[in-house]
Amino acid sequence: MNDQFNGSLSRRNGQSNAWLWAAAGLGGLMAARALLRRAREFDFKDKTVLITGGSRGLGLVLARELAAAGARLAICARDPHELERARADLAARGADVHVFPCDVTERAQVAEWVRVCQHRFGRLDVLINNAGVIEVGPVEVQTLADFEEAMRTHFWGPLYAILAVLPEMRRRRAGRIVNISSIGGRIGVPHLVPYCASKFALTGLSEGLRAELLKDGIVVTTVCPGLMRTGSPRNAIFKGRHRAEYTWFSISDALPVTSIQVERAARQIIAACKSGDAELIITTQALVAVKFNALFPELSADLRALVNQLLPAPGGIGARRAKGKESESALAPSLLTALSDKAAERNNEMS
């Protein structure tokens, strides 16, 4: 009897010791991570920050926040008129800002932009790959060209910019790269298949580079936002029953229960870059969706298929493209989209 009791007690003590060692190990890892984050803390004052797609929406809001932090800014976008309005906006806030017309899908243009920035500022501290396109509609109306455009913008464009800044960052053994992916780069969303496919590619690129570039002193952060009130639906592309597509998309983008104020999102992104975080998922809804998909992939897929049944069927203008501002309906714009509409006015999305 005593032998059995002693054996049972010994096993319990062994289990308790194992839990204590595990807890101590976890505590040590957390402490080491906290120390590492502090060591990576980054000050934006007088640092040169390059932002693609910086003339409107999230890119412009990031530029404003970084200007307030004392950064020197270099922004690029395709539309020179939008760029000039953004330059005036930022200069009025006291920013040291350089603007450059550039299509990120053209490698030569990206290389020239980076060359000009290095010549002007002398060093390249931060690259934020933000430029994006959105095509909304069922897969039946999405063409190969839509997929190619999304990949050129969300994968090849960031890669071109990264390859252009890497030599200077490697030479100094310092630099930050922030890749703006999406919740759509974590979970496939119906009626956004070209967008999601290209954002998945960007997420994979960003995570792989994070692992490889840390040894060179270069910190890569992957950002996966949920819906943000940038005002961008006006300039997104809608296909098929484009008015119905614009209605559901713009309302979802505007409601406080489904989206976040873009200024809050921008501050979170800047904080993640400053701390050198590996990943940032923006909005509680997006974080819950990612965790749920990881834990219950079959159920998550079935729910998304159910959502797809509720979205507009193919038809309408078919594969032709219409911008959001060409797709307005009785409900969009309306009181339901008011917050997004105001954001469009603030963030240079009205052109």
Regions found by a protein language model. Give the residues of each.
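Residue(s) in the substrate-gating loop at a strand-loop-helix junction
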Residues: 182
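Active-site helix of classical SDR
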Residues: 162, 198
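SDR active-site lid
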Residues: 215-287, 294-295, 300-311
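Conserved glycine-rich cofactor-binding loop
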Residues: 48, 55-56
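The beta1-alpha1 cofactor-binding region of Rossmann-like NAD(H)/NADP(H)-dependent oxidoreductases
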Residues: 80-81, 100-112, 144
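Conserved glycine-rich Rossmann-like NAD(P)H-binding loop of the short-chain dehydrogenase/reductase
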Residues: 71-85
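Substrate-binding pocket helix/loop in short-chain dehydrogenase/reductase
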Residues: 138-139, 143-148
